[in-house]
Swiss-Prot record:
It is an enzyme of class 5 (isomerase). This is N-(5'-phosphoribosyl)anthranilate isomerase. One of its GO terms (biological process) is L-tryptophan biosynthetic process. It comes from the Bacteria. It comes from Paramagnetospirillum magneticum (strain ATCC 700264 / AMB-1) (Magnetospirillum magneticum). Keywords: Amino-acid biosynthesis, Aromatic amino acid biosynthesis, Isomerase, Tryptophan biosynthesis. The gene is trpF. NCBIfam families: PRK01222.1-1. Its EC number is 5.3.1.24.
């Protein structure tokens, strides 16, 4: 099976078009105002209209309250909710039940011990995403161009699909897939020319490299 690819932090039609044309499986929209990739619900609603039905539209949230989720989900047609904050298993389950959408819980890791944090989420999330721990003092929980030791994931199984993120680029994604065994990868800053500005050539190169990176 080819590696699945998620292009996250899309803010304009050009990036959306390229991601779709090159066969991205997931496109991510960020609903977190401190991020340079943040989009308003109305803007996001416009962007998802460019994505065909077989492309999974993902909304990234950081410790969202119900009001935030209500505002976005009444305007934007999303298929998957990505929770990238400190949401507890109880909160993940509550969001999943309230909104009737699958949830991908992000876990920030730097070493093998951090993987133990996945256990409480296995019964309440639909998918996991392993991202690098943000640098100390960082405002953003992800999209920081920081990676981690991919070998800590080698041979690991959780009973849920999982995705790899954290400092991935066209130059290293094939190796990351080979070492970690990831069946899906997520990129944001690694396909940008500046924070929040996606680079079409980098998107193309990333997807091509990711798809060639798994035996």
């Amino acid at each position: 099976m080819p590696v699945e690819v998620k292009i996250c932090g899309i803010t304009d039609e050009d990036a959306m078009d390229v991601a779709i044309e090159e066969g991205a499986d997931y496109v991510g929209l960020v609903f977190f105002p401190p991020s340079p990739r943040n989009v308003t619900p109305d803007r996001a609603a416009e962007l998802v209209e460019f994505a065909p039905g077989d492309v999974t539209k993902v909304g990234l949230f950081v410790d969202p309250d119900d009001a935030t989720l209500d505002t976005v989900l009444t305007r934007v047609r999303l298929d998957l909710l990505q929770l990238h904050g400190h949401e507890t298993p109880e909160r993940v389950e509550a969001i999943r039940l309230e909104y009737g959408l699958p949830v991908m819980k992000v876990l920030s890791v730097s070493d093998a011990a951090d993987l133990d944090a996945a256990e409480p989420y296995l019964a309440v999330a639909d998918r996991l995403l392993f991202d690098a721990k943000p640098p100390k003092g960082a405002v953003l929980p992800g999209g920081n161009a920081v990676s981690f030791d991919w070998s800590i994931l080698t041979g690991r199984k959780w009973g849920l699909p999982w995705m790899l993120a954290g400092g991935l680029t066209p130059a290293n994604v094939a190796e990351a897939v080979r070492i970690s065994g990831a069946a899906a990868v997520d990129v944001s800053s690694g396909v940008e020319s500046a924070p929040g500005i996606k680079d079409s050539d980098k998107i193309r190169a990333f997807i091509k490299a990711a798809r060639g990176g798994r035996p």
